[in-house]
Amino acid sequence: MPWIQLRINTNSDDAETISDLLMEEGSVSITFEDGKDTPIFEPKLGETPLWRDTVVVALFDAETDLTPTIAMLKTLPFLGENFSHKVEQIEDKDWVREWMDNFHPIQFGTRLWICPSWREIPDPTAVNVILDPGLAFGTGTHPTTALCLEWLDSLDLSDEEVIDFGCGSGILAVAALKLGAKNVTGIDIDYQAIDASRANAERNDVADKLALYLPEDQPADLKADVLVANILAGPLRELAPLIAERVKTGGKLALSGLLKEQAQEISDFYSQWFDMDAAAHKEDWSRLTGKRK
């Protein structure tokens, strides 16, 4: 069935209020969009950030008469009589199929492929990670994930113990295991990430080699030959002593989730524990690597 879409230009202070009112008016879904192409790279812990100029997009059943809703919105002091909005009719589509069509197998490095579960594997002889992008988090398309996957592909992980700090979907953990790691420990603050990592490990027949923990449950004596942390600059700095403690002497480290302008500061900070290499870059993002002193 077709839908009616109402787009309202507002700001971050009023977006949530408008969203609540539109839900009361019968909207079946609400999304927020960036009104002026303003990136938000690193929200604070627990924060759900919005852009200063935010577009509230509400979807209604096609039979809905929006005249009373728009009249109500005009009475709001922060919108006013002439508030900026647009009403559109949206034809129905097979949204799931359209979403699935956007995901294709991607190669990282020389050996590794990330393949959506519904796609044919391009090279059966390669190291193939079968991933369901609907489960959560990393799919390999983001530059930071790609940088980490390329780094893992470049290593000889045979019989190595690996830690994936901030494991998300488990894409890095599963890739490490498929590339020959002896075992991997995945750590994440999100229960959904733990579930997603477990599901993707099972899908790739490596679940028996993957241990998953919330931060408070990780073993106190945990150490690894290789540690990869694709999180953000703030947590990387805050967790640096713990991350350093988790890497064996001579072990390898990769850090990502960093903007180019953040890389040097984080590299300098980690240099008290690691011999750091030059940063690698992809688009606006960076990856740092080093060897434990």
Swiss-Prot record:
Q: Which UniProt keywords apply?
A: Cytoplasm, Methyltransferase, S-adenosyl-L-methionine, Transferase
Entry's EC annotation: 2.1.1.-
- Which top class of enzyme applies to this chain? transferase
One GO biological process term: methylation
One GO molecular function term of this record is:
protein-lysine N-methyltransferase activity
Tell me which domain of life the UniProt entry assigns to the organism this sequence originates from. Answer: Bacteria
Q: Where in the cell is it found?
A: Cytoplasm
Residue positions binding S-adenosyl-L-methionine: 145, 166, 188, 230
User: What is one term from the GO cellular component aspect held by the record?
Assistant: cytosol
- Chief site of localization: cytoplasm
Recorded hits in HAMAP family, A to Z, give: Methyltr_PrmA
Q: Report the family membership.
A: Belongs to the methyltransferase superfamily. PrmA family.
Record's function text: Methylates ribosomal protein L11.
| Protein name from the UniProt record | Ribosomal protein L11 methyltransferase
Q: Which organism's genome codes for this protein?
A: Shewanella baltica (strain OS223)
Q: Which gene encodes it?
A: prmA
